Amino acid sequence: MQYTLKARHLAVFLLAILAPTTAAIPAPQALTSMVTGSVTSQPIGHYEFCRAFRAECNQRLASRPAPKLTPHGWALLKKINSSVNGRIHAMTDKDIYGREEVWAHPKDVGDCEDFALLKRRELAAKGFSLADLLITVVRKPDGEGHAVLTVRTEQGDFVLDNLDNVVKPWYQTSYTFLKRQASFNTGRWVSIENGRDVVVGALR
């Protein structure tokens, strides 16, 4: 009887630990994943970044389904997103380098794409595949261009954004999604076919 009671207490304790983490992963919706199209133009900043860091851009990856996001993986996404957002101070490329479109791994300051690059590197170091860590170009509601990191998962595409400490499914943002890195080649970019659908869905 005492053993059974202890086992029951242990089960309740484990559920108390695991349940909030598991429940935090958003449930799939109609706009779970982006629909990508053909190969499109590579941002000039990424082109120049690839010339300096060829190893990050010459990986050709086998086409495969997006992996299932585990509670541990979900916790890592949230941790790294908020950690990088807190450690790096946002500044424009013009203010940092005196010119636009300089993509780099930031140390103290960086533009939006620099935040995305650092999150990509840190998640890859934790075991995420580069095929699922895709820098993405979007348009903000005010028309300004912006860059975020998209993470492909079986449960859908999630966005890590330097303007938001909350990791969200892409369809819960107010952005128009334009293009992103190809999952099959880290140096190629593909268009996003349903990038405007998410804006319509967010306004409903």
Task: Locate the predicted segments by residue.
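Bacterial N-terminal signal peptides that target proteins for export
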Residues: 2-11
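General helical structural elements
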Residues: 10-12, 123-124
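Bacterial N-terminal signal peptides
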Residues: 11-20
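A structural boundary/capping signal
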Residues: 2, 24-204
